[in-house]
Amino acid sequence: MKTFLVFALIAVVATSAIAQMETSCISGLERPWQQQPLPPQQSFSQQPPFSQQQQQPLPQQPSFSQQQPPFSQQQPILSQQPPFSQQQQPVLPQQSPFSQQQQLVLPPQQQQQQLVQQQIPIVQPSVLQQLNPCKVFLQQQCSPVAMPQRLARSQMWQQSSCHVMQQQCCQQLQQIPEQSRYEAIRAIIYSIILQEQQQGFVQPQQQQPQQSGQGVSQSQQQSQQQLGQCSFQQPQQQLGQQPQQQQQQQVLQGTFLQPHQIAHLEAVTSIALRTLPTMCSVNVPLYSATTSVPFGVGTGVGAY
């Protein structure tokens, strides 16, 4: 019985020891499972250096902000644009000197002389000599072109004389080419104005200080008598006096027309252009390039 109890106690001790060993083994097996999540916790604890690494680039951002000031320094380039705007402003005043140069290069008298040179009728002397009857007709009071102050009413031609001069003028005007009629009529009126100036109807500017009142009145009376006593042979006499006409042309090249003479020239020209074509039943084409702009001062065309 004692042996049985001993064996029973041994068995109990063995079973308890085995149970303890099993529990220890089980606990040993469970502890590594519990210890395995600990390293991730340590890894999570190691994340602060990562946060520190994240914090380290953050201080590097000021370096980017420090690099931005040079970009802000590029803004002075925009501030450098005002000098460009300042350069544009001096360009505009540079245009004004060009306009001033145009005004300085062409004084008023030179501009008028250029206009006159462009509008002086270019007509052959033979054509003007051919239209000499028209010139004599226009100089007398039998035409509306003649002015009252040039001739007295008592010296007016008779209607028969005017009719004869009218026929001669129309015959010569019809023989001139149509394209040359306008310039020829304008040249005749121009020569009449200059002839009046030479004969003393209008005093030239250069001769005003030298002439006296009595000399002017005598020259006007002589010219009125010459124009009032014109005969039908006057055109033929003038046709044969070419040397005298050349001398008159040389003398009158230095004469100048005054502004009131220019207005008188335009008025007489417009009347003649309305009278002669209707009177002679001829076509006189008008050119706007010469009719719209008046004559200037300082012309040098002689009377034919």
Swiss-Prot record:
GO terms for molecular function: nutrient reservoir activity. Gliadin is the major seed storage protein in wheat. Gene3D superfamilies: Plant lipid-transfer and hydrophobic proteins (1.10.110.10). It comes from the Eukaryota. InterPro entries: Bifun_inhib/LTP/seed_sf (IPR036312), Bifunc_inhib/LTP/seed_store (IPR016140), Glia_glutenin (IPR001954). The keyword Signal applies. Keywords: Repeat, Seed storage protein, Signal, Storage protein. This is Gamma-gliadin B-I. Residues 32-92 are annotated as: Disordered. Residues 41-92 have a biased composition (Low complexity). Pfam families: Gliadin. The gamma-gliadins can be divided into 3 homology classes. Sequence divergence between the classes is due to single-base substitutions and to duplications or deletions within or near direct repeats. SMART domains: AAI. Belongs to the gliadin/glutenin family. SUPFAM superfamilies: Bifunctional inhibitor/lipid-transfer protein/seed storage 2S albumin. The keyword Signal applies. Residues 1-23 form the signal peptide.
